[in-house]
């Protein structure tokens, strides 16, 4: 795959993503935190914004509506989030972190600091990976 170059970019990014998720899961496990890395974008957004609708979460994390629903069901089953109907629009579900979800965030914050430092070191090189990804995403949006 590596010799194919640009034609394999999707495969290489997927491989990198899978490795980062796997390593992230091992880090959480080493801190005795029962957490799936795929839950991170939802948990983090709710930690910052406190209450969001399903559509707002999907838009903010960049997932499709069905993928977001599936992820939310998983988190609800784990009792990390709960949902309630919006009083102004009963078709809309509002999502919040439960007490268990908030405790989880408190437990994870020191780990996020470590992960952020490590990821910054990993991507801060001659061709900054994060900047390159952001530039590519912007080009794709045009």
Residue ranges with predicted function:
Residues 54-55, 66, 73, 93:
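Residues within helix-turn-helix
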Residues 1-33:
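N-terminal leader segment of winged-helix/HTH proteins
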Residues 22-64:
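N-terminal helix-turn-helix DNA-binding core of bacterial DNA-binding proteins
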Residues 5, 9, 38-39, 100, ...:
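N-terminal positioning helix adjacent to the helix-turn-helix/winged-helix DNA-binding module
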Residues 23-31, 110-122, 135, 139:
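Generic non-transmembrane alpha-helical segments
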Residues 1-2, 125-142:
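C-terminal regulatory/oligomerization modules of transcriptional regulators
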Residues 73-131:
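Charged, amphipathic alpha-helical coiled-coil/dimerization segments
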